[in-house]
A protein has these predicted regions:
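Conserved AMP-binding/adenylate-forming core of the ANL superfamily
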Residues: 21, 25-79, 96-101, 151-156, ...
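Conserved pre-ATP/AMP-binding loop-to-beta segment of ANL
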Residues: 21-23, 160-187, 194, 216-221
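Conserved AMP-binding A3 loop
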Residues: 36-40, 183-209
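Structural core segment of the AMP-binding/adenylate-forming
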Residues: 79, 83-158, 172, 576
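Conserved ATP-binding/catalytic segment of the ANL
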Residues: 188, 434-436, 441-506
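Conserved AMP-binding/adenylation subdomain of ANL enzymes
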Residues: 206-224, 228-329, 333-354, 364
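Conserved ATP-binding loop and adjacent catalytic segment of the adenylate-forming AMP-binding
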Residues: 248, 340-347, 354, 358-370, ...
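Conserved C-terminal "lid"/linker of ANL adenylate-forming enzymes
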Residues: 504, 529-533, 538, 579-603
Length: 603
């Protein structure tokens, strides 16, 4: 039974009642030994903390700093802050000194949770710039609090004693929280200036967790590996709480072991994780006995044919242009015949070969939602073809997480899936500002037309904290300009093409989106990093870092990046790879061709 709530505080309270003694979170004690915390314990610890915070003078609506990584103390602290009617201002322990001294004062933080003593030592050096902070609370239960710092466990015990005497201020505060109240202020990275504080209401986050397209229940297990202060991972953890799912705090280093011993049925993930796993699988296959290598390539080749035809039959291939009914029907028949013919062989190799890949990459996974960046096409295809459903989503901090997401029934590779229920998306012309999609004046309502993505709905932020100018730049009449370029496909899925600010305008006046070109070039095993350039030039160029692993496979042994960049044969092979990838056959126009490039000796 899932929990429906209008605020995070209500969610914690109801989850304790509904899910009770079921495991809410698992914390690693040893390699395969986990300490469980059930839903009732999570709420009670949070309520004790909230009581102590209120007793200290924490006001409703106040902003509380929360500098920590994924750990049980994070969710307990967050629970306490939410129950007390306050809003958290989270960041990881890798936060820079510059961000600490900007974010905490800007957010008007008076009380700040810190994960460990090491972070406290950094803060001591910066204290002259953090004069508004009156109280620091150490979270790590294995460390003693330095002088002048409170300890989380002491506050919980203080709150426990107060509650034992009948103190119920935590419940009173929690019930007073309204959906339109602030739940969190998340500061986005300030790559072009100071970080901006995204104000998210309880209603934003609660609506989001109702839209996550995965069916979970009390018997499901999730791994937490993405930074919990990011809205994507945070929304997934709140979703798990609502569903009664058990969440285990893992890490990239322990992921391989945890996929086997926890056997998760769900997890949030990032493209880089799948890229690393993809390369590891390919490296293992390449190093295997020739017979095993043959079986691997044969098995995957059959899976590619089988799934490619199956996706065509189920309308799961991205239609960027309106399909010709006759050609589509003919293709449907041909794919049906091919699918029938390959099924027996695929069935054998699926059990004998592909099952081993699934076991290594998480055979128990019902699905994983990948966010935070675009999945490379070849990686996307590989895992979905071998039978690991990767549901790519698209969103941002300003929208409390996903705007769109694939579902198991709408798993269209190379897209980020359909728009979430209750959310509106429009595609806007970059030059004239006219609505391209949905527009009844345009052919097919504007499907297949490229433009800037704007979004509206209950997931959109209130604005940037104390920064009306930045808010006005991206918000107009409830619509938020994402700054991303995309199109709606003819099977009603969104396809991301790049960033509007990344658009290159050639001397001819042609607008070029570099991201699709860069993503295609990265599919070559010879290219490790690439940046397409060419603003105001006649043609496009590229800055390329050659791949050590890719060239080692071709016999360029014991050579570093600098040596590869100076090697004439490397230059010839990269030129051939560029010509092969950026071609008309792969859907690129003549002005999108890369006519010049430079090999860089380092990243």
């Amino acid at each position: 039974m899932s929990v429906k709530a209008s605020t995070a505080a209500e969610l914690f309270m109801k989850a304790a009642d509904v899910h009770g003694t079921r495991v809410a979170f698992g914390t690693r004690l040893k390699s395969r030994l986990w300490k469980p915390t059930n839903f009732a314990e999570l709420y009670e610890e949070g309520a004790c903390l909230a009581t102590a915070l209120i007793d200290m003078g924490l006001e409703r609506g106040e902003h509380v700093g929360l500098l920590a990584d994924n750990r049980i103390e994070w969710i307990i602290s967050n629970c306490g802050i939410q129950l007390a009617g306050a809003a958290d201002v989270p960041r990881g322990t890798d936060v820079t000194d510059a961000d600490i001294t900007y974010i905490l004062p800007h957010a008007d933080v008076r009380i700040c949770f810190i994960e460990n003593v090491e972070l406290w030592k950094r803060i001591q050096v910066l204290k002259s710039e953090l004069k508004g902070i009156e109280t620091y609370i150490l979270m790590n239960l294995d460390q003693s609090a330095p002088e002048g710092v409170l300890h989380l466990k002491d506050l919980i015990e203080k709150g426990r004693a107060l509650r034992k005497d009948g103190d119920r201020r935590a419940e009173e505060r929690a019930k007073a929280v309204q959906p339109e109240d602030l739940s969190t202020i998340i500061y986005t990275s300030g790559t072009t200036g100071s970080p901006k504080g995204v104000m998210l209401q309880h209603s934003n986050i609660m609506y989001m967790i109702d839209c996550i397209p995965v069916d979970l229940g009390p018997h499901d297990r999730a791994l937490s590996i993405l930074p919990v202060w990011h809205i994507f991972e945070r929304a997934l953890e709140m979703f798990s709480i609502a569903m009664g799912c058990s969440t285990y705090y893992s890490s990239i280093r322990m992921l391989g072991d945890d996929l086997k011993n926890v056997q998760p049925t769900f997890m949030g993930s990032a493209p880089r994780l799948w890229e690393v796993l993809y390369m590891r699988i390919l490296d293992n296959a390449q190093a295997a006995h020739p017979v095993r290598r043959f079986l691997f390539h044969t098995g995957y080749g059959l899976a590619e044919i089988y799934k490619n035809s199956l996706f065509y039959l189920k309308n799961r291939t991205p239609h960027l242009h309106k399909p010709n009914p006759i050609l589509f029907s003919l293709g449907w028949i041909l794919h049906l015949v091919r699918w029938i013919l390959v099924t027996p062989l695929y069935g054998f190799f699926n059990v004998a070969v592909l099952e081993r890949i699934r076991q290594a990459a998480g055979a128990s996974l019902k699905a994983t939602i990948s966010g935070g960046g675009a999945l490379p096409r070849h990686v996307d295809q590989f895992f979905n073809y071998v039978g690991i459903p990767v549901l790519e989503g698209y969103g941002m901090t300003e929208t409390a997480g996903p705007i769109t997401a694939r579902t198991l029934n709408r798993l269209v590779i190379e897209t980020v899936g359909p728009v979430l229920e209750g959310v509106e998306v429009k595609i806007v012309d970059l030059n004239h500002g006219e609505i391209l999609y949905p527009n009844p004046k345009n052919k097919h309502m504007g499907k297949g037309l490229r433009g800037e993505i704007h979004v509206k709905g209950p997931i959109v932020m209130r604005g940037y904290y104390k920064n009306q100018e930045a808010t006005d730049k991206v918000m107009k009449d409830g619509w938020m300009n994402t700054g991303d370029i995309g199109m709606m496909t003819f099977n009603d899925c969104l396809k991301i093409l790049g960033r509007s600010k990344d658009t290159i305008v050639l001397a001819s006046g042609e607008n070029v989106e570099p991201v699709p070109i860069e993503n295609r070039l990265l599919q070559s095993p010879l290219i490790d990093h690439v940046m397409v350039v060419g603003q105001d030039e006649k043609n496009l160029g590229a800055l390329i870092v050659p791949s050590i692993e890719g060239f080692q496979a071709l016999g360029f042994e014991s050579m570093g990046v600098a040596e590869l960049a100076d090697h004439p044969d490397v230059e010839k092979r990269v030129a051939a790879a560029i010509k092969q990838e950026i071609s008309a056959e792969n859907g690129f126009k003549s002005f999108e061709r890369v006519t010049d490039f430079r090999l860089l000796p380092q990243t």
